[in-house]
């Protein structure tokens, strides 16, 4: 089984104004790890940073923006660092994200402004050329009417394509691309990425806490939002779902949320640094 589901971006804010408390209670990490970045971000004057995890504090409040509290934003690499360094779970083989989601749900002041869920196919279910063709010939069933295909070139050579389902300004968008090509690695690796903002992001967190598993929830969201079809009926809702897409979604339901993925830096080096800094 080579399909996997992982959290690939997370941005949330809470009313708590002390960044050290947020780092300890919500992230399960040591505040001493985070250093002043020397710049502001997302409407905050100060950023404490460790790897690609940014903890923003001292909000630039005015009559429009009040009680900004603390905002935490982690990119894909930051998410992997969080999984590696967080003490929210004792089992190093268990992702700390479900515990973080429980904390966010329990805090009525918490707001999740963005979460990306990556659904990776490394087993050969998805073919980018086939997906591009389906989008261009409108052989897909989705309530999202905005669709686009971005083709990249290296000189005159076509080097890859990215499919977008949903409007750039919407609170929900799907991005499909060749992750192996992006990372410059061998083998098959196609990523279906769910980009959720504001209302959809908060709804996902809410459902994730009560869902049997985050990976099953991700599969349900994918299945609800889009399916690639064979045009074998005049009524699109009765068209046959492509076997390769059905198999991919079925496989997603069977996988576990990935934890402790390899980060783009040496975890051992970080742990040694932590020992040196905080004993």
Predicted regions and their residues:
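Structured, helix-rich domain cores that form ligand/interaction pockets
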Residues: 1-266, 270-277
């Amino acid at each position: 089984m080579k399909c996997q589901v992982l959290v690939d971006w997370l941005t949330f804010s809470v009313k708590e104004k002390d960044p050290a408390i947020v780092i300890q209670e919500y992230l399960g990490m040591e505040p001493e790890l985070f250093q002043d970045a020397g710049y502001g971000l997302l409407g905050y004057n100060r950023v404490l940073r460790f790897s690609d995890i940014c903890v923003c504090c001292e909000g630039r409040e005015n009559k429009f923006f009040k009680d900004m509290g603390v905002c935490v934003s982690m990119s894909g690499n930051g998410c992997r660092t969080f999984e590696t360094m967080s003490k929210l779970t004792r089992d190093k083989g268990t992702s700390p994200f479900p515990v973080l989601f429980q904390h966010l749900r329990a805090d009525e002041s918490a707001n999740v402004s963005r979460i990306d869920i990556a659904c990776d196919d490394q087993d050969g279910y998805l073919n980018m050329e086939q997906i591009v063709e389906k989008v261009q010939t409108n052989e897909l069933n989705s309530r999202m009417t905005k669709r686009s295909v971005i083709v990249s070139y290296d000189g005159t050579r076509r080097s890859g394509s990215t499919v977008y389902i949903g409007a750039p300004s919407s609170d929900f968008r799907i991005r499909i691309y060749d992750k192996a090509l992006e990372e410059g690695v061998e083998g098959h690796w196609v990523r279906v990425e769910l980009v959720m903002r504001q209302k959809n992001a908060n709804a996902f967190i809410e459902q994730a806490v009560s869902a049997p598993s985050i990976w099953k929830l991700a599969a349900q969201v994918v299945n609800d939002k889009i399916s690639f079809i064979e045009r074998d009926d005049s009524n699109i809702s009765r068209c046959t779902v492509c076997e390769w897409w059905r198999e991919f979604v079925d496989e997603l339901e069977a996988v576990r949320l990935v934890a402790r993925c390899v980060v783009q830096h040496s975890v051992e080096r970080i742990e040694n640094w932590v020992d040196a800094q905080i004993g």
